[in-house]
From Swiss-Prot:
The lineage of its organism: Eukaryota, Viridiplantae, Streptophyta, Embryophyta, Tracheophyta. It comes from the Eukaryota. Residues 1-24 form the signal peptide. This is Expansin-A21. InterPro entries: Expan_Lol_pI, Expansin, Expansin/allergen_DPBB_dom, Expansin_CBD, Expansin_CBD_sf, RlpA-like_DPBB, RlpA-like_sf. Belongs to the expansin family. Expansin A subfamily. Residues 48-168 form the Expansin-like EG45 domain. Keywords: Cell wall, Cell wall biogenesis/degradation, Membrane, Secreted, Signal. GO terms for biological process: plant-type cell wall loosening. GO terms for cellular component: extracellular region; membrane. May cause loosening and extension of plant cell walls by disrupting non-covalent bonding between cellulose microfibrils and matrix glucans. No enzymatic activity has been found. May be required for rapid internodal elongation in deepwater rice during submergence.
Amino acid sequence: MAPPSLPILLVLLSLSSSLSSSSAAAAGRWTDAHATFYGGADASGTMGGACGYGNTYGQGYGTDTAALSAVMFGDGLSCGACFELRCGGGGGGDRRGCLPPAAGKSIVVTATDLCPANHALPGDRGGWCNPPLHHFDLSQPAFLRIARFQSGIVPVSYRRVACRRKGGMRFTINGHSYFNLVLVSNVGGAGDVHAVAVKAGGGRKARWQAMARNWGQNWQSGALLDGQALSFTVTTGDRRSVVSYNVAPAGWAFGQTFTGRQFT
């Protein structure tokens, strides 16, 4: 049998890439964990956080947010990922705190913070976020959609799901000349950004430059980017990439936020 022609090969590669991306974006398997809550009735205490999003209301995440235990947080690489939770997992614990199935349907939350370990306490008596435990410290409004306030802690099952966002990805440029710190937020699809590259200007000499993750979802470049239009390539944990060309005009200023393309 003759080998396929180049156009056919390109089509096959494209189909393979699409299937791989669809598989990566599909919901993962259910895993047992536990959940608590923090931040107050209006979730104001969840603002800020180890992902660097600051005001999660303004970043589009609302109150459906969670702080992850250290083993799940991955030093910030899980920031922006989405998880579906349902109360009453198989990992043990008191399920009486769960709302009835008809009332307590599953919820989808975004990882926006770290639940720090407390090695002074055992994992089943306050050290909920100690390694190797899988734990969600939910915003209070999110917790109350699946469990009763008085329960405090409940067993849950969770799985990774694709993030659904309104509008495009957001790029907030902070820092100063030669220290550009770009916060990437409102990321759809896998949600967890694992790599960012920036290109300044549009001339022939313009080259993509890899950025280094500084903390959370703040990405750093030591190049002089002032006075040039900026393009960004964002790659998520499932190895999918989206390019936003000239998302920031040449006259951009530090402190501004720009909206680019989105994962679909």
